[in-house]
Amino acid sequence: AKFKNQDDIEKAKKAAGIDYGKWYSDKVVYAYDYFDGTDNIKEAEKESHGMHVTGIVAGNPVNKAPNSEKVYGVAPEAQIMFMRVFSDRDKTTASALYVKAIDDAVALGADVINMSLGAGAGSTVDAGSDIIDAVKRARAKGVSVVIAAGNSNTFGRGFSQPLAENPDYG
């Protein structure tokens, strides 16, 4: 684990000039709701796309499933930094929140940033230059950035001639 204890993440926060966010456990080493400006990341919905994806990626079994099997994520020893950028109330956000969360993740030493932002059909063409620049800064620091391109088919759905540079079109 990169952060062995709460003191390690607090030192990283101090070095990065970050005075917000909360340590929850050895697994969830940092959490902050950028939209609400609080440490409370509990979502109103019982099932959340971002939380679900996090479980697929970094889930490690605490209890056995009903069939007595244990379910693991693809990287069960990974530590998590939850950085929420969407409102729980109306599912809105702002590009400045994406940028701040990306920059903070890099400053705190993230190896991978997953942005579960998928919508019906979208692309980086729709992202503002500030978000694209933040992703480029992260990549320049060696951070892998993974962004959902859509959750409902390919970008090309509904477009007779989708842009060739959109890699999710097959």
Segments (PLM) and residue ranges:
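Subtilisin-like serine protease catalytic core
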Residues: A1-Y32, D36-A94, L108-D111, R139-G142
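Substrate-binding/access-modulating region of protease and related hydrolase catalytic domains
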Residues: N40, N60, F82-Y169
